[in-house]
Amino acid sequence: GAHLGFARGWPESPVRQGADLVIQSLHKTLPALTQTALLHANGDRIDRERIRRFEEIYQTSSPSYLLMGSIDACVRLMEAKGRQTMEAFSLLLDEFHAGLAGLDQIVLSGREIMRQGRMKDYDEGKLLIAAQGTGLWGGFLYKEMLARYHLQMEMAGDSYVTAILTPWDKEEGLMRLS
């Protein structure tokens, strides 16, 4: 996620972890327009000249200045306020998870899996809402979340939906989700 690595308590960004090539979709978790992303070449194992050749093949001769401006504004914002924004988001997520402690039927994966030692790290902004054994299926949950609660889920599986929570989600939306 493009939002990772800005504050303690969150996983490090793949760039800082040493990934050779990273594509960060800004529009998923940061305040940037849809279709915006950054490509990072990291270290000396990447042939940058080869990347430039492919860019020449696939890039447009008429770039969207609106999208490029959105990328620039997003990067500037995160440079100036990224840590502060992510720390405030962490506090909001703590409140959100505390409000979900008494759920009987629906399982929220993530923190519990971490406590069991089955995962090294995870992004608390990704929420897997699993409904195994409830008689509900993911497609139904997906549609209900939108129709009844005005919440757009990222995707649906057989027995779950995935939500992506961001620092720019309103507390009101998180309360509807809880």
Feature roles, as predicted:
Residues 95-178:
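Conserved C-terminal alpha-helix-loop-beta "cap" of PLP-dependent enzymes
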Residues 1-109:
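Conserved PLP-enzyme active-site core in the AAT-like
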